[in-house]
Regions:
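Juxta-kinase regulatory segment immediately upstream of eukaryotic protein kinase catalytic domains
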Residues: 1-17
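ATP-binding glycine-rich loop module of kinase domains
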Residues: 15-57
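Protein kinase-like catalytic core scaffold
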Residues: 37, 72, 86, 142-144
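The N-lobe alphaC helix and its flanking beta3-alphaC-beta4 segment of protein kinase-like domains
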Residues: 51-69
Length: 177
């Protein structure tokens, strides 16, 4: 199967594989021939449960907010406003989702998410705590999405996110879909 070439500001990257699709875009593992990166292509598909304005602008603003707060996220390497693409550091490792499935979530990962919460909550922010948005590389937990929202109790980690960080009824129901 031929691989697609994807450009970011006229720099060419070769698609290795689709990593996943989220509310705002498709994420691809790409290479420049030397290094691997994640290329996020913004999409404009409807989302029943989320309202968007300018998705690229929102991603850029959210990235800045999360960098200021200081949680572990992949570095943004570049972005292309014309093609609505973001190039970011590739964090190679297992997602919390996969670790939950395999019964391999360690207490240290929960300690690390709690440390993130101590930075996020005073800044009045929530992130998307779904376990596919977290990758462990060299025992360090990274939030690999850039989405963040104003804090609300309903969507905080303790009331929503934690339900998907172990084999709960909610996690198992989602896993069947």
């Amino acid at each position: 199967m031929p691989r697609n070439n994807l450009n970011v500001n006229e720099k060419s990257f070769t698609e290795i594989k689709l990593l996943g699709k989220g509310k705002g875009g498709y994420s691809y593992l790409v290479t420049d021939g030397k290094n691997e990166f994640v290329l996020k292509q913004i999409h404009h598909e409807p989302c029943d449960y989320y309202k968007f304005g300018n998705k690229l602008e929102a991603e850029l603003n959210d990235y800045r907010r999360l960098k200021e707060v200081g949680i572990s996220i992949p570095e943004m390497i570049d972005f292309d406003g014309k093609t609505e693409r973001i190039l970011k550091e590739y964090i190679k490792g297992s997602t919390i989702y996969d670790l939950v499935l395999n019964g391999e979530v360690k207490e240290s990962y929960l300690e690390q998410i709690r440390a993130m919460l101590k930075l996020l909550y005073p800044a009045k922010l929530n992130i998307d705590y779904f376990p596919t948005n977290f990758v462990v590389q060299n025992e360090i937990l990274y939030y690999i999405d850039y989405e963040c929202n104003s804090y609300s109790d309903e969507w905080n980690f303790e009331n929503w996110g934690i339900k998907y960080w172990s084999k709960t009824e909610e996690f198992m129901a989602y896993n069947k879909t």
